[in-house]
Curated annotation (Swiss-Prot):
Membrane topology, record value: Peripheral membrane protein
Quaternary context: The complex is composed of two ATP-binding proteins (PstB), two transmembrane proteins (PstC and PstA) and a solute-binding protein (PstS).
Amino-acid positions noted as binding ATP in the UniProt annotation, renumbered to this chain: G53, P54, S55, G56, C57, G58, K59, S60
Enzyme class (EC, first level): translocase
NCBIfam families for the chain: 3a0107s01c2 (TIGR00972)
Functional note: Part of the ABC transporter complex PstSACB involved in phosphate import. Responsible for energy coupling to the transport system.
Source organism (scientific name): Streptococcus pyogenes serotype M18 (strain MGAS8232)
Keyword tags: ATP-binding, Cell membrane, Membrane, Nucleotide-binding, Phosphate transport, Translocase, Transport
Protein's UniProt name: Phosphate import ATP-binding protein PstB 2
Family: Belongs to the ABC transporter superfamily. Phosphate importer (TC 3.A.1.7) family.
Length: 267
């Protein structure tokens, strides 16, 4: 078995003016267990960044920390900085609901509301006091078009969201997330429950979305990371080992552990 130098690191950085988000010395603890170990990482605007690594490496925990989703776990504790527009959104005085408007989340399995397709999009807006039907109609159409779903559902908006296929439900969840105009979309293995055709459709949607959004995606699928992302980050045991342009990670990794992981030799 290969002995790796786990102190070896190769992590790129970006000019300040190109950043969508960054973390500094980010740690996540579940009780006494340290799940994320002091990660410094930057994300470039309007790019797709894939987080990869074996199960339990911390990539989903890291992703969930970015918009404070770990706050919902009683034993979780997050320290360090999460910098969005120069502001540390990990401060305890920050409104987590406002943070999540700017950093939207799409989960592993499609989770549409038990409502119509239309109401899935308008629910949050109506809760916020938007009553003008013309405004709501426009939000629905714009969001569904951006998620590449409008043409398939425009005549069925008042049918249950559960009548949609799995891939369509996931794109509905994307439409719901972008309807509140976030800057960043966080995706936690969004294609894991989808068939290959729906996965390709989702990736095509992501390519269109990155014109307007920064996307950070967790994936176990190496082919998906290689196809769909601009940058890839390799996590192992709570550490960020290597972070670079995707083509470099897959063709010229600087760390032996990264090279062996993406080529299927461990993990």
């Amino acid at each position: 078995m290969t002995e790796y130098n786990w102190n070896e690191r190769h992590i790129i950085t970006f000019p300040e003016e190109t950043l969508a988000l960054a973390t500094k010395d980010l740690h996540v603890y579940y009780g006494a267990k340290e799940a994320i170990k002091g990660i410094d990482m930057q994300f470039e605007k309007y790019k797709i960044t894939a987080l990869i690594g074996p199960s339990g490496c911390g990539k989903s925990t890291y992703l969930r920390s970015l918009n404070r989703m770990n706050d919902t776990i009683d034993i979780a504790r997050v320290t360090g900085e999460i910098l969005y527009q120069g502001i540390d959104v990990n401060r305890k005085d920050m409104n987590v609901y406002e943070i999540r408007k700017h950093l939207g989340m799409v989960f592993q399995r499609p989770n549409p509301f038990a409502k119509s397709i239309y109401k899935n999009i308008t629910f949050a807006h109506e809760r916020a006091g938007v009553k003008d039907k013309k405004v709501l109609d426009e939000i629905v159409e714009t969001s569904l078009k951006q998620a590449a779903l409008w043409d398939q559902v425009k005549d069925d908006l008042h049918k249950s969201a559960f009548t949609l296929s799995g891939g369509q439900q996931q794109r509905l969840c994307i439409a719901r997330a972008i309807s509140v105009k976030p800057d960043i979309l966080l995706m936690d293995e969004p294609a894991s429950a989808l068939d290959p055709i729906a996965t390709m459709q989702l990736e095509e949607t992501m390519f269109e979305l990155k014109k307007n959004y920064t996307i950070i995606i967790v994936t176990h699928n190496m082919q998906q990371a290689a196809r769909a992302s601009d940058y890839t980050a390799f996590f192992y045991l709570g550490n960020l080992i290597e972070y670079d342009k995707t083509r470099n990670i897959f063709q010229n990794a600087q760390c032996q552990s990264t090279n062996d992981y993406v080529s299927g030799h461990f993990g």
